[in-house]
Amino acid sequence: MACNDGDMEVESISFENSDILSCRANDTAVDFLYKYNQKQALYLTIPAGVLENKEKTVTGTIPNNYKLYYRTFSDVVSSSYFCNTIYPASPQITFNSEATGGTVTIATRPIYNENTGALLRYDHQITISNLVLLKEDGNKLVESNLVFGTYQTNKQ
């Protein structure tokens, strides 16, 4: 991030140490996934049925099949913020940017117990290539390969 006349300006997106979360933990029936870090968040909407517990790779485009939002907040945000039907009054969203382009790839693979061979879970690795976001100054921020992360679902 860079400072410009007292305003925070986004130069790159980094959520490397943030887990992917949903309001229905470890469930494939989700319509959005999110990750947050202090006063910022990424919010990805996904089509119904795209997460399945079977090995496959799916792709889609932003803003057609998927939507991605980058948000900053007036104060530290918690996971409970995202699961409310109506967002709470605090913290306030201070900046909201909807991505205007990008390709979302979700690679799903089963994870097995190394000793017994029993199926443990499914990992859904989500990457976004050629992501385009508008910054507060109106300029574009382009991330050629954003690793959104791995969302895990139960084996059922």
Language-model segments: residues:
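Bacterial Sec-dependent N-terminal signal peptides
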Residues: 1-26
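Generic structural hydrophobic/aromatic packing signal, biased to beta-strands
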Residues: 3, 44, 104-106, 128, ...
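Compositionally biased, intrinsically disordered low-complexity regions
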Residues: 8, 51, 62, 103-104, ...
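A short, compositionally biased
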Residues: 25-30, 127
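Surface-exposed helix/loop patches within compact recognition domains
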Residues: 29-121
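Edge beta-strand at a domain terminus
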Residues: 124-156
